[in-house]
Amino acid sequence: MIYPNPSSNNQDAVVNLQKHVVLNVPRERWLQAQRWEGDLWKSVNRPLRNAAKRVLQHIGLRTREVGDDWNHWWAERLDRYQFVPSHVENAIEFGCGPYTNLRLISNGRTIDHAYCSDPLLHIYLNFRYTWLSESYRRQRVLVDDHPMEQCPFASDFFDLVVLINVLDHVHDASDCLRQAVRVTKPGGLLIVGQDLTSEEDLALPEVRSDIGHPIRVDHQTLDMFLQPTFRPILYRILSRDDGREPLAHYGTYLFAGSKG
């Protein structure tokens, strides 16, 4: 399903938000979500489990790097990133997680300087045999552990900015969206993928009590931040039934745009 694009002339004016939209939370609530996220991935990446994966690799039953967090799912729905140029000078993925989407975007492409940014990198870089940890060890990626709200990079710097499955984990989604817009170079690409929440979704106890995802956004809010500045190359909103978690999210936002 594709929804119409509402227009806006001011990405800084967050007005008339529906009560199901939660764009910022207290710092302690965000830290609670971060602890939950870190504990989740540490449990997934236990040493014995990774050792078993390495054995499978040696006998030819798996590829070199291990781990995936719906990254292939997002890639399929974002047209396998066919709109991304074959050569990118500077690229960054915010909220890259332990497995990253850049690992798929970089396939068949040359990225001169690839940055992976996540406040939990001190955990993720200790995981063995992931694309992120292996690429960092070989000095193929640069890393940054600032919260996205405190992004240290220069304005208009990146040719490619990736923000997939991130906003529901942050402290202040408005600040994060402004940072994504700010650091994208004129003519550069911004890719956004995000689960969406409605009033109907938020009425569910299991959604309201979700520790790891304190932020809730809808497609109108994302359009308000992105549409004034970016020319859409890809714009889709998947229906509830086509999303990853149909019981919790009314849709999935898919966007790629060139900064004007």
Map each language-model feature to its residues.
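Conserved class I S-adenosyl-L-methionine
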Residues: 191-220
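A short acidic, Gly/Pro-enriched loop at the edge of an enzyme's catalytic core
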Residues: 146-161
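Core SAM-dependent methyltransferase catalytic element
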Residues: 229-260
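Class I SAM-dependent methyltransferase SAM/SAH-binding core
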Residues: 92, 97-150
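A short SAM/SAH-binding and catalytic strip from SAM-dependent methyltransferases
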Residues: 160-171
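A short glycine-rich, Lys/Arg-flanked "PGG" loop and its adjoining helix->strand segment in the class I
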Residues: 174-189
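Short alpha-helix
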Residues: 212-230, 234
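Class I SAM-dependent methyltransferase Rossmann-like catalytic core
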Residues: 3-84
